[in-house]
């Protein structure tokens, strides 16, 4: 949590600088700051916090990403219930295939002792938090400038992570070249580039379509964890990855034109 606290505090500082230099408009209503703060804490602090705490409790990075890959199903169901978004038949099939593919890989990895129940529980909490933040962003934060909006969200997430860091760690950090490199990557690529891209996608498409892209996170994470951490890929895992990618393709594929 200390790492996340530093990440969000520094990301907030960068976004503030950009917002001031380019004179981006700030929200005028106080309620907008509350909505942005709720999204920031849910999506950034609790979402990634659940992932980090799960990994800290001996769950493998690949398995952690695979569990988070179940988020599209939860998001699609929640969007249908609370935001009345409709799903085409092929999208329902795609979500089911994606779920099956992720479940296949997660089950295979857990059978190999790659995770613990507490680690899975924290990851599930993170998945629910990411879903909540995504829906809240779609419902409450549309029309707000992405730079100033992200500044408020990272400020709220940073404060929350600072408080939680004292509950789950000593609040101390050991700075090494690897840690500094990871921090720079998470700030520039994940907190800035990826966050702006996510918010743009949410503003352009349905929650189910955007969330289905999260199915690709487990595939990429498992492939990256193979050479970096020595986490093996079994036939079951590879099969699950293929099924997952087919499912995502069905969800995001544009609907065909109705023949005349």
Please provide the spans of the model-predicted regions:
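Helix-helix packing/entry segments at the starts of transmembrane helices
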Residues: 6, 63-70, 135-158, 191-227
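Residue-level signature of transmembrane alpha-helical cores of multipass secondary-active transporters
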Residues: 36-40, 65, 95, 119-127, ...
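Specific alpha-helical transmembrane segments that line the substrate/conduction pathway
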Residues: 2-13, 43, 52-86, 126, ...
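Transmembrane alpha-helical core positions of polytopic small-molecule transporters
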Residues: 39-48, 71-72, 106, 127-134, ...
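Hydrophobic transmembrane alpha-helices of multi-pass small-molecule transport proteins
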Residues: 15, 78, 87-109, 127-130, ...
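Specific transmembrane alpha-helical segments of multi-pass solute transporters/efflux pumps
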Residues: 16-68, 104, 187-205
